[in-house]
């Protein structure tokens, strides 16, 4: 039986962690990312923590902020 860790068992959390990693790599604060994705900082923090499911528009705006097309 294949073992799974907490991240792979929860794809939402895995994506949220990748968004956080990309934000840290490009050097944006959570406030800057909230502005770039047009959500409140509180909502952004919930998305980044994997505590709330995020819409496609949020993902698209993250990609644009990170320079990914």
Regions found by a protein language model. Name each.
Residues 2-25:
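A short, Lys/Arg-rich alpha-helix, primarily the initiator
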Residues 57-69:
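DNA major-groove recognition helix of helix-turn-helix/homeodomain DNA-binding modules
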Residues 26-49:
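Short alpha-helical DNA-recognition segment
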Residues 22-25, 50, 65:
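Histidine kinase transmitter module recognition
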Residues 16, 34-37, 63:
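Small-residue (primarily alanine) positions within well-ordered alpha-helices
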Residues 17, 27-28, 54-57:
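Residue-level signal for the short linker/turn that defines the boundary of a DNA-recognition helix
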């Amino acid at each position: 039986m294949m073992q799974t860790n907490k991240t792979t068992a929860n794809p939402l959390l895995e994506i949220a962690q990748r968004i956080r990693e990309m934000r840290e790599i490009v050097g944006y604060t959570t406030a800057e990312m909230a502005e770039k994705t047009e959500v409140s900082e509180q909502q952004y923090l919930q998305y980044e923590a994997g505590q709330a499911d995020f819409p496609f528009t949020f993902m698209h705006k993250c990609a644009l902020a990170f320079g990914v097309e």
